[in-house]
Amino acid sequence: TGRTRAHRARHPRGCTAYTSAQLVELEKEFHFNRYLCRRRRVEMANLLNLTERQIKIWFQNRRMKYKKDQKAKGILHSPAGQSPERTPPLGGAAATCLLRPAAAVPAWPTTHPS
């Protein structure tokens, strides 16, 4: 209610204020995986009482912060032939859904019946 019209015009949906517990969980997840598949995003949203959109935007913003920090440290541009640490999966961010060990599913049989 103390917001100005100019602020509301620039931020029509409002700004999300994350709790410290939510931030801890989001940062932990980011440490393991910078890109979330939809399934994991839904799990995180339910776990943290946030929307999928809030999770998605938080990860986008966090990746930009990470990229900026790496650039400031001079780490982002590695010598030719060496890839930077943790690049996004091939085929787009949603192409691969890496499950954490607690959520792992049993592997399918590798042989085909004759």
UniProtKB/Swiss-Prot annotation:
Compartment(s) of residence: Nucleus
DNA-binding region(s) in UniProt: 11-70
Record keywords, A-Z: Developmental protein, DNA-binding, Homeobox, Nucleus, Transcription, Transcription regulation
Physiological role: Sequence-specific transcription factor which is part of a developmental regulatory system that provides cells with specific positional identities on the anterior-posterior axis.
Any GO CC annotation of this UniProt entry: nucleus
InterPro entries xref list: HD, HD_metazoa, Homeobox_CS, Homeodomain-like_sf
Membrane spanning residue stretches: none
Region of interest: Disordered: 70-93
Name this polypeptide is given: Homeobox protein Hox-D3
Xref: PANTHER family: HOMEOBOX PROTEIN HOX-D3 (PTHR45664:SF5), PROTEIN ZERKNUELLT 1-RELATED (PTHR45664)
GO biological process, one term: cell-matrix adhesion
GO MF entries: DNA-binding transcription activator activity, RNA polymerase II-specific; RNA polymerase II transcription regulatory region sequence-specific DNA binding; sequence-specific double-stranded DNA binding
Main location, first listed in the record: nucleus
Tissue: Predominantly spinal cord and kidney.
Record family assignment: Belongs to the Antp homeobox family.
Protein encoded by which gene: Hoxd3
Name of a matching Pfam family: Homeodomain
